[in-house]
Amino acid sequence: MDLSLTEFFEKWVIIIRSDNNKNKFNLNQTFLIRLRIQNNASIGTFSEVAEFGEVIFLCTLGNAVQDAITLSGIEKFSNKVIIDVTNPLDFSQGLPPKFTATIGNSLGEEIQRLIPEAHVVKAFNTISVNIMVNPKLEEGTPTLLISGNNSDAKKTVTTIAEDFGWEVEDLGGIEQAFLIEAQAMLWI
């Protein structure tokens, strides 16, 4: 199924990125206004997304995850599916970034510990946005690796990924997020 970015937002209403200091979304305003008018989508603070969303894409820089979740209100993530698109990368010394996760302490695991009542699924963190919702490659259908502790949450993420056009391989529990995160260094 070919899905445009607008169709993706219309179907899954999600979000987004932030300007870390102001708890506001930071996307192309023209796109957001058009999306809002055409699809009745809405924008808001991290807190509003956490309260409203049932499936939330967490797309911050790795070092901004804790602030984004804390600003949102940890309690608002209870029973929500959190698709963790983050990577544990430190860009403070420039490029290439430093990989900061260790076995047993991946960013996915840290997020799950921070919001224990949420259902965190690591996915989409090793691909570029231009193929995220339309992964058509000459070589064939690509495989998306996922990991998480809740089987229903992983089914939700699998459905989203398959709607986009991905084959999905479930690596197991959230402790496997380290293996997926480590692949980000190959992509960068």
Please annotate each region the language model reported.
Residues 1-34:
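NAD(P)+-binding Rossmann beta1-loop-alpha1 motif at the extreme N-terminus of oxidoreductases
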Residues 6, 68-72, 94-95, 134, ...:
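Short amphipathic alpha-helical segments
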Residues 36-81, 87-94:
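Rossmann-like NAD(P)-binding element
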Residues 61-64, 126-128, 150-152:
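Short beta->alpha connector loops
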Residues 78-81, 85-136:
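Rossmann-fold NAD(P)-binding glycine/threonine-rich loop
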Residues 113-120, 138-177, 181-186:
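Internal alpha-helical scaffold of NAD(P)-dependent oxidoreductase catalytic cores
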